[in-house]
A protein has these predicted regions:
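Substrate-binding cleft of carbohydrate-active enzyme catalytic domains
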Residues: 26-31, 76-79, 83-90, 101, ...
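Non-catalytic carbohydrate-binding regions of carbohydrate-active enzymes
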Residues: 245, 249-283, 314-476
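Extended glycan-interaction surfaces of carbohydrate-active proteins
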Residues: 76-113, 130-153, 196-227, 267-359, ...
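The feature captures the catalytic groove of carbohydrate-active enzymes
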Residues: 27-51, 58-61, 150-161, 195-261, ...
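Well-ordered alpha-helical scaffold segments within catalytic/enzyme domains
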Residues: 59, 63-75, 122-133, 163-179, ...
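Carbohydrate-binding surface patches
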Residues: 462-496, 500
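Acidic/polar, glycine-enriched structural segments that form the non-catalytic walls/loops
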Residues: 23-112, 172, 177-179, 188-193, ...
Length: 519
C-alpha cells in the first residue's frame, strides 16, 4: 500500500501531539440555542405538505445530533447555513433499500425508484459528508451503485456524475477505509460503463446538455454529440479519485490505470476544449468548431484542479466579475450576459440554462474559485473578497416573498424564481451551500493523512469573529474560532483551533495552518 502523502509548499503551523490524549468533548462550544431558534422559525413558516424521514417536529433533534454548528457576523450566510441543513434533511427518505436523498420534494414522473434522481448526486454527497451519522450517505452511495442498476430502467447514467470524486472526498472526512474497499469495485465498473457509453475515439467524452442537467443552453443540444467541459471534467475528477482510492488500498494496477487516464484526459481537455481566442473552456462541436458562447460550465475544470497553473488559464476568471460576463445582481449567470442568445429560450416552461442563475452551477463555480484561491499561484484577478462577495450574494438569493426559500433557478436581475409556485421546486435539493461554508469559506480541508488543514477565505478585516463548531472529522470533534479582540467568546484573542474540546493552536492572525493530529 502506498502511504506517502505529498503536500504543496506553504507556510505552516506544525504542532506535535505526542503527549496529547483523547478528550471527549461534552458539549459544543457554541451551544444549541441559535440552532433551536432557527429551526423554530423555519418550522413556523412551513406548511410541511410532504413528510419524509425527519419531520419538522424532529428537525431540531436530528440536526443537533448531526450537523456542525456555525456562527458569524454575516446574518445572511449564517441564516442560510442553517436553512440549508433544515431543507437538506427534508429530502432524507427511508426506503426498503436504505436511506436516500431526493432532489424533488414531490414525486416527479421522470425520476427513478423512490423518486431518486442522480443529477445533483455529487453535490448531495459533498453536502452530506459533514453529517455525524455516516449511515445516510453510505446508504445513498450504495443505493446508486447496487440498487439502481437492478431496476428495469436504471437512472444513474441519466445524468453526468462526479460520484467517484464525491465518494473519495467523503472518505477524506470520515476516514472510513472499509467503505472505500466495499464500493471501489462498483465504482470501477461504473467508470468503464461511462467509457463504453460516452467516450469518443479521441478519448474525450461527449454529452447532450440535457444529460448534463443543463438543457436549453446556448451551446448544447439534445441530439448532437458535443464535447463538453462538464462530463470531461467529471471523468477526470473520477479518474483521479479512483487512482487515489486504489492507492489507499494498495491496488497498484488500478491506481496506475486511472492515473494514466487522468493524465491523458487533462491534456485532452486543455488541448481541445480551451478556446484561446475566447480565453475560456468551451463546448466543442463534432465538426471541430467551438460554440461561440462563454458559459458558466467553463469554470468546472477548476472544481477538480484540472487546469495547469498558468496565467493564460487564470485569465478566464476575469469574466466572473464582469457585468457583461457572468456578474449579475442576483448571482452568477449560466451564460455570458453579452451573448445575443442570452435568455432567449423562454422562461419557466422547461429548465433553461441560457443565462438564468442556477444554484447547481453557482455551487460548482464557487467550489472551483475556492480551489483556484487555495491551490494555484496564478489567480488572475481573483481574491478571497471575490469569493466572499459571491457567497454572500448566493446566500441573499435564498428568498421568496420575504422568507427563506430554495428553488430551481432565478431571474438574474430580479431574483424571481422562474418555476413560480410549482410544488416540485420547493426546497430543491440540487446544489450545495453548507459545504461551501465549512470546506471553503472557513476552509477546513479534509486530507488523507493525519493532518488538520484550515485555509480560510474570509477577507482580512471582514469579520471580527466567527466559530465553526462540532465538526466530526477523522473521528474527532473539531472547533475553529476567530475572535480578534477576545471579547466574543472569552477564550483569548485570535485564531484558535480545538480538538475534542482542547485548544491545540492559537495564533494572532486568521491564516492558513497545518496541524498534526493525534494518532
Amino acid at each position: 500500500m502506498i502511504r506517502r502523502i505529498f503536500t504543496s509548499s506553504f507556510i505552516t503551523v506544525l504542532l506535535s501531539f505526542a503527549a496529547y490524549s483523547a478528550y471527549a468533548q461534552e458539549k459544543p462550544l457554541l451551544g444549541y440555542n441559535k440552532l433551536k431558534t432557527y429551526v423554530s422559525y423555519f418550522n413556523a413558516i412551513d406548511t410541511e405538505t410532504v413528510k419524509n424521514y425527519v419531520t419538522n417536529d424532529h428537525a431540531y433533534n436530528w440536526m443537533a445530533k448531526n450537523i456542525p454548528l456555525f456562527e458569524c457576523p454575516d446574518s445572511a450566510i449564517q441564516k442560510i447555513y442553517y436553512y440549508r441543513w433544515w431543507t437538506f434533511r427534508k429530502h432524507l427518505k427511508q426506503t426498503p433499500d436504505g436511506f436516500i436523498f431526493t432532489e424533488f420534494i414531490t414525486p416527479v414522473k421522470f425520476t427513478g425508484v423512490y423518486n431518486s434522481s442522480s443529477s445533483a448526486l455529487g453535490h448531495q454527497i459533498y453536502e452530506g459528508r459533514w453529517l455525524h451519522d455516516p449511515q445516510y450517505i453510505n446508504d445513498y452511495i450504495k443505493f446508486w451503485l447496487y440498487v439502481d442498476p437492478k431496476q428495469k430502467k436504471p437512472h444513474l447514467h441519466t445524468f453526468s456524475s462526479w460520484i467517484d470524486d464525491a465518494v473519495y472526498n467523503y472518505y477524506l472526512v470520515n476516514n472510513d477505509k472499509k467503505f472505500i474497499e466495499q464500493v471501489i469495485p462498483a465504482l470501477n465498473t461504473d467508470y468503464r460503463q461511462w467509457e463504453a457509453e460516452k467516450q469518443l475515439p479521441s478519448k474525450l467524452f461527449w454529452q447532450f446538455d440535457v444529460r448534463d442537467a443543463m438543457e436549453e443552453s446556448i451551446s448544447g443540444s439534445r441530439i448532437v454529440k458535443n464535447k463538453r467541459p462538464t462530463i470531461n471534467s467529471y471523468m477526470y475528477g473520477n479518474a483521479v479519485a479512483l487512482s487515489k482510492m486504489a492507492s489507499l488500498l494498495g491496488i497498484d494496477s488500478v491506481k496506475n490505470k486511472y492515473s494514466k487516464k487522468a493524465i491523458e484526459l487533462k491534456k485532452l481537455v486543455q488541448d481541445s476544449l480551451w478556446n484561446d481566442s475566447a480565453s475560456f473552456f468551451q463546448v466543442r462541436r463534432p465538426d471541430g468548431s467551438f460554440a461561440d458562447a462563454r458559459e458558466e460550465l467553463g469554470f468546472i475544470p477548476w472544481y477538480f484542479k484540472l487546469p495547469d497553473d498558468k496565467p493564460a488559464y487564470a485569465k478566464q476568471w476575469d469574466q466572473l466579475t464582469d457585468e457583461k460576463g457572468f456578474n449579475a445582481p442576483w448571482g452568477i449567470t449560466t451564460a455570458e450576459r453579452r451573448h445575443p442568445l442570452f435568455r432567449t429560450h423562454g422562461t419557466g416552461h422547461g429548465c433553461e440554462w441560457d443565462g438564468a442563475v442556477w444554484p447547481f452551477a453557482t455551487t460548482q463555480t464557487l467550489k472551483g474559485l475556492a480551489v483556484l484561491l487555495t491551490n494555484y499561484q496564478n489567480k488572475g484577478s481573483m481574491t478571497p473578497a471575490v469569493f466572499y462577495n459571491e457567497l454572500h450574494k448566493y446566500a441573499l438569493s435564498h428568498i421568496k416573498r420575504g422568507v427563506p426559500y430554495l428553488g430551481e433557478y432565478q431571474d438574474e436581475k430580479t431574483g424571481y424564481w422562474l418555476k413560480g409556485d410549482n410544488p416540485r421546486s420547493s426546497y430543491y435539493n440540487h446544489s450545495g451551500f453548507c459545504d461551501l461554508v465549512i470546506n471553503d469559506l472557513v476552509g477546513l480541508k479534509p486530507r488523507a493523512d493525519n493532518m488538520l488543514e484550515v485555509f480560510p477565505l474570509i477577507p482580512q478585516n471582514q469579520w471580527k469573529w466567527f466559530a465553526l463548531d462540532n465538526v466530526l472529522y477523522h473521528g474527532q470533534r473539531i472547533s475553529i474560532l476567530w475572535d480578534k479582540t477576545g471579547s466574543k467568546y472569552h477564550k483569548g484573542k485570535g485564531f484558535i483551533i480545538y480538538i475534542d474540546g482542547k485548544p491545540i493552536m492559537r495564533c494572532a492572525k486568521l491564516k492558513h495552518v497545518l496541524l498534526k493530529m493525534p494518532v
